């Protein structure tokens, strides 16, 4: 009886790919792509990037031994096929779910995940470090960095290549070019040059010629080597886009078709034979094999699932209409003000859609700047604009602003320049997990002199804070807000200026005081209702500002309260609670203090409900902590 299983069903580890023919590898790639489409349609996740590197993923595991050889996937959101082929296929349904596998490579999840990733442009640095350690220890494993999907716009990638060219370690950099950012030449000469540089005979002869001339220690040999090098470089510069990489010290190969399995396998086998740093330029199509994703790559970069696997049409979800997202409120408010104020500019680091700055881009493209994956440059670019009298608003995810802390301090705050930082995805972000949670911004910004730090509790406050930052504060301002929906409150058409450093009362009470910052106000109110049911009357204040802190309000409340609780969606170390503790200590207050926030740990991935429950930031857990604290029974 014929085996009815698919070829993918026979793959239990990468070792099973070694015996497959090119045609079988092509079949396997198609099966992987089909399974990925079905998987994302059910569960959601990063999508188009993995579709684009399906053939490359299969070819890499066919040629290399990833139990020994090291593949570092830049960013990591394109590694779903890699995970399927490395013993995790049966767990892919748990991808990005609480208790399931991560959506990114993790060294503790599989020996095939050589380096943990999640942020862009890190792969070449990691690969260079791994290779240098290998050489010091006398190893012979191969090291590969797969980078692309925008990551080549990050300066760290070029810093790493510059160093790698100097180190001369055996590292293969694979440039996954799915945006045609490095325009490939076309025509017969280009095809001939690609075949020529990948030819084994050519590369062997090239090595022998260079070695022979190296033994001829005379001026004639040096002149001959220089002439040959110039001839080869000139040919490559004329026929391929690789001259830049050659100048950094990496031998350039390609571009080749990233969906042609035969070309990929041949090229990778040739790369194995070259003992120096090299770059293989692979042209792919983001979203390959799923027409809706090919035609609209940005929208299909990631998806929440629930779409038809042929048409891509997403099923409409029943229930009430969604409330506005904080990102939408921010984007619309900024456009509203910028239409009346030509000094306002908008800056993003490759996240126009995620931050809703695409609204600004459409309305005022001449004042919109997408600097690429270059957060440090974005901040200093904003500083330059502010110095010249503009009002730059720099929208960056909290987790990515970490990469630009030096620029925030040195280029903005030190000069007291009026840059507004719209810190998106502050707090927990859900399924993307620890590489993307915005858990530290209050902690790392709190110490910066002269920086005003605000956090809205709802959409209207976000509008008012943005207006206040642009028109009523002289100096740099940071506004942090979470991913997801606002509370659905009705928002005014006008803007109201907030008094810097002043909070507001949300609820009067006679028992413990809860001081909240940002969207934890809703949790505080719900916890307060639970405590009221137990006979504990709580007082709740929305502090609005971490810096300057409303010390007058704290002093007034602590004058009569015996117990104060701080509540924040930030690390418990160095954030809002720490600021309140510092003030109470300096003021010699006898009031007892309980700080509630994210633990001193990296929080896993999962739904927001699961993560709030795990971290003790859901209303029942907050109420229980306050009850035990107030009644004197906390551990």
From Swiss-Prot:
It comes from Chlorobium phaeovibrioides (strain DSM 265 / 1930) (Prosthecochloris vibrioformis (strain DSM 265)). Homodimer. It is an enzyme of class 2 (transferase). Its cofactor is Mg(2+); thiamine diphosphate. The keyword Ribonucleoprotein does not apply. Pfam families: DXP_synthase_N (PF13292), Transket_pyr (PF02779), Transketolase_C (PF02780). Belongs to the transketolase family. DXPS subfamily. Signal peptide: none annotated. Its EC number is 2.2.1.7. It catalyses: D-glyceraldehyde 3-phosphate + pyruvate + H(+) = 1-deoxy-D-xylulose 5-phosphate + CO2. PROSITE patterns: TRANSKETOLASE_1. Binds 1 Mg(2+) ion per subunit. This is 1-deoxy-D-xylulose-5-phosphate synthase. Mg(2+) binds at residues 149, 178. GO terms for cellular component: cytosol. Keywords: Isoprene biosynthesis, Magnesium, Metal-binding, Thiamine biosynthesis, Thiamine pyrophosphate, Transferase.
